[in-house]
Structure formats: C-alpha cells, structure tokens
C-alpha cells in the first residue's frame, strides 16, 4: 500500500468497548461489520489497532478524492477559523462562489443546497411538483433514492418501503430499468417527473442500454414530463466524467447530488435548468450551503481538477475492470460499470467475499445480495488494485 498512515500508538478503546457502547446508545439501523476505524489517507483506512485496509467502499462513493485529502483538510481548517455557521437569511462569499462553480460543472442554471442525498432527492421531487402542479412520479425497479419518506416514495426495494406504507407520494409507478417503452406507458396526465439513476448503485451497479436515457429524455419532452437524474452516487468523477449524464449525452431538468460533493464533508444539492426554481419560502435548509461545507466542496473540486481525477477514474476503472474480468473463477456472472463504479455479480450471495476480504485487508460491500460493489477513492493505485484483485481471487 502506498498511502501510509502514521499510527499514534495510543489505543483509546478496544473493539469490544466501542461495539458495546454503540450497541447500548446508538439505534441499530446498520448491520455493521466488526471493524473500528480510526484514520484514513488516500485509498487506505486504519483500525484502532493499526491494521490497514484498502478501502473499496469509500464511505459508499463519498471519498472520491481520498480520505483526508490535504487540500480539503486545509480548506476546512482555514474556514473553521473564520466562520462556521450563519443563517441563510444572510449572504456568504463562499456559498456564492461554490454556487457559481457548481452551476458551471453541472451545466445547469441554478442550485439549492442541503445536507445529504435523501434531502437532495426530496428537494428535486418537491421542485418537480411545484413546477408542474402534478403529484405522480415514475421510477425504476431496483431503484434507491433514499430512506426519508418522500425519497422512499420512489425507492423500489420492498424491505425499505413496506414498513412505511403509504409513503408521501403513493402515486409512483415502478417500471423495469432500461425499458423506455415502459416509461412511456406509465406516464399519466398527473405525472410530474420521471426519476432515474443514470447507473443504479444500490440495485446492483446496473448500467442501462446505450440509448435508453436519450429515449427517456425524448419521451419526457413529448409528454411535458420533467426528468430528474439522481447523481448522488455517480457524481464528481465516479464514472469518469463530472457526472454520469455526460456518459450518455443526456441533460435532465433537475439533478440531485451529494456523497462526494464535499470530499467527505456532509453536503447535498440539486441543480436545475433555466426556468425551474423554488420561490421564496417554498423550500429551505438551515445548514444547506454552510461555510464549512462550501469550503470543503470547493477544495474537493479543486483537487479533482488539479490531479486530473476524471481521467484517472477512467484509466483506473478500465484497469480494475480488466483485472477483475481476468480472475480465475467460475462463479462470476458479470463485471460491469463505468469508471470506478464497478459491480461484480456472483452466482450466489456474496457475503463471504466481504468477510474474507476484510480479514485480508480489503474493504468491499455487497449490494443486491449477489453483487460486489467496488467504489474506491479515485486516487487508488494500480498496485492497490492488484492487491484487491489478489484477495478477491482467493475468496
């Protein structure tokens, strides 16, 4: 591993102590792995005992510029010494600067800031409803857009939806992913928007057919329906371009973003085309576009540009995919994805891969039961990729 972490040598708590305290005081909403992490640098994280792991989870596609990128760290430190938080009742230079930057890289007209992906999807849905006066949505099977009540309305997986039915918008039609004709049939006079992930993440790293999103765009134009892209997981270089929409040459009306936007610092946003915007009082976020978040986001974008991480994502993604496809295994169904958003579909539930990899210094996660999702920091090296593939080949 090339990313070296300096170990302080002083253990504040053992695994059992941390896990016991978590079990006692934290609502158990996650099926956590038995791992207590304390540090990170680049594509490597370290546990409290000093053991290092190549991180192919990256906070679930959050740490695109790597853990604790020095440019991001310095920006947060500098901003924290000047201004941490003020109400959005007032202007700040750094928010205005980041809004301009985000509008530029998205190619869209205006933005709204929030704090997470689910909030961004909620804002996109709310904007679609207020802009059209309609209340129904069309979404894809196997979609994931968040677990808050509104976002849950367009999230397909029954284990997330069923305990909370009916959601805020019960008028959601779910259709097969990558089936444009099904979308055409599902759109009604009350459909405000079609909501899609350009590549489905939680659903199994599902890449649509090449012409699918263009056809959906045409259908939306013909029917006067808005098109929302959920780029929460696919954004900021993950697939080899700023946003996955560029891979398919399709522009949405509204786009939701989060995860990698702040270089690891919590932030979310939506961007909208000309003519789509909330009016005063129609939506708000106390912490949205806060000074620390904007400082982190500007620094993250700076790092992506200066270190040519878009190009690196393409290069390392192609290398990783080739290496994974060449593994001497007969239980692999398919290796798919774009850039450094890669899914490895296995013939059976892949939990054992996750456990074996962790025990051998590699972090991966399972999605859709039988798909290994690999979304490492874009700064991962070929040597680290080789190490990951060696471990997975043995699992």
UniProtKB/Swiss-Prot annotation:
The record ties this protein, via SUPFAM superfamilies, to:
PLP-dependent transferases (SSF53383)
Subcellular localization: Cytoplasm
Keyword annotations from UniProtKB, A to Z: Amino-acid biosynthesis, Aminotransferase, Arginine biosynthesis, Cytoplasm, Pyridoxal phosphate, Transferase
UniProt enzyme class: transferase
The pathway entry for this protein reads as: Amino-acid biosynthesis; L-arginine biosynthesis; N(2)-acetyl-L-ornithine from L-glutamate: step 4/4
Binding locations of pyridoxal 5'-phosphate: 117-118, 144, 230-233, 286
Which residues are recorded with the post-translational modification N6-(pyridoxal phosphate)lysine?
Answer: 259
The reactions it catalyses are:
N(2)-acetyl-L-ornithine + 2-oxoglutarate = N-acetyl-L-glutamate 5-semialdehyde + L-glutamate
Task: Tell me one Pfam family matched here.
Answer: Aminotran_3
Which CDD domains does this entry report, sorted A to Z?
OAT_like (cd00610)
**EC number(s) given by UniProt:** 2.6.1.11
Give the main localization category: cytoplasm
- Which BP terms in the Gene Ontology apply to this protein? L-arginine biosynthetic process
Q: What is its cofactor?
A: pyridoxal 5'-phosphate
**Its quaternary structure?**
Homodimer.
For this chain, the family text in UniProt reads:
Belongs to the class-III pyridoxal-phosphate-dependent aminotransferase family. ArgD subfamily.
**Protein name listed in UniProt:** Acetylornithine aminotransferase
């Amino acid at each position: 591993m090339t990313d070296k972490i300096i170990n302080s040598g002083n253990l504040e708590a053992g695994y059992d102590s941390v896990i016991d305290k978590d079990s006692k005081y934290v609502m158990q909403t996650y099926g956590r792995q038995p791992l207590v992490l304390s540090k990170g640098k680049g594509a490597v994280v370290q546990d409290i005992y000093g053991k290092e792991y190549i991180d192919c989870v990256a906070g679930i596609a959050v740490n695109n510029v790597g853990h604790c990128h020095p440019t991001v760290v310095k920006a947060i430190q500098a901003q924290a010494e000047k201004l941490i938080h003020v109400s959005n009742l007032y202007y700040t230079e750094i928010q205005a600067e980041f809004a301009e930057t985000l509008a530029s890289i998205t190619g869209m007209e205006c933005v709204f800031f929030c704090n997470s992906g689910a909030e961004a999807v909620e804002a996109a849905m709310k904007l679609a409803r207020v802009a059209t006066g309609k209340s129904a949505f069309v979404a894809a099977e196997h979609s994931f857009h968040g677990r808050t009540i509104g976002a849950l309305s367009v999230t397909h997986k029954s284990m997330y939806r069923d305990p909370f039915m009916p959601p805020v918008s019960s008028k959601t039609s779910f259709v097969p992913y990558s089936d444009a004709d099904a979308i055409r049939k599902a759109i009604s006079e009350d459909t405000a928007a079609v909501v899609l992930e350009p590549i489905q993440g939680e659903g199994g790293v599902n890449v649509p057919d090449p012409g699918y999103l263009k056809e959906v765009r045409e259908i939306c134009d013909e029917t006067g329906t808005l098109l929302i892209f959920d780029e929460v997981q696919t954004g900021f270089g993950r697939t080899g371009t700023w946003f996955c929409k560029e891979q398919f040459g399709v522009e949405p009306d509204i786009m939701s973003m989060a995860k990698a936007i702040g270089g690891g610092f919590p932030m979310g946003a939506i961007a909208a085309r000309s003519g789509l915007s909330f009016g005063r009082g129609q939506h708000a976020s106390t912490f949205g576009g806060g000074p620390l978040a904007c400082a982190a986001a500007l620094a993250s974008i700076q790092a992506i540009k200066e270190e040519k991480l878009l190009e690196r994502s393409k290069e390392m993604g192609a290398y990783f995919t080739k290496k994974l496809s060449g593994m001497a295994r007969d239980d692999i169904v398919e290796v798919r994805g774009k850039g450094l958003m890669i899914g490895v579909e296995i013939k059976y539930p892949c939990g054992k891969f996750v456990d074996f990899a962790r025990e051998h210094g590699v972090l991966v996660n399972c999605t859709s039961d039988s798909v290994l999702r690999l979304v490492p920091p874009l700064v991962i090296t070929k040597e680290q990729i080789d190490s990951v593939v060696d471990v997975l080949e043995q699992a």
